[in-house]
Amino acid sequence: MPTAVPEIQHHTALHRFQCTVEGRLCVADYRMAGNVMQMTHTGVHPSLEGRGIAAALVAAALAHARTHGFKVDPQCSYVRSYMQRHPETLSLQS
């Protein structure tokens, strides 16, 4: 049975949302360019794929952007496809 996604942590100094699952670090990285979060990379170990971990990381990043009034540049292909699957997030796109 898939493990529940642990709490997502935001490390502002690293420009990263992350969690650890089964001892493996899972991340959603970004850069700031003014008030735009450039979402550059989402990484989940192949053994953990299909559990909703990447989606949880991206959802946390987009919630942070919305709360702080940032726009999002989805440079990562996973973030782009997530936003397309969740049209309520498209208003964040820069």
Q: Which sequence ranges carry the predicted segments?
A:
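A short, internal acetyl-CoA/4′-phosphopantetheine-binding micro-motif in the GNAT/acyltransferase core
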Residues: 43-49
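Hydrophobic/basic alpha-helical segments enriched in Actinobacteria
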Residues: 16-20, 25-26, 35, 48, ...
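N-terminal first-folded block
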Residues: 1-42
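Conserved acetyl-CoA-binding loop-helix of GNAT-fold acetyltransferases
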Residues: 50-61
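C-terminal structural segments of small proteins and small subunits
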Residues: 60-94
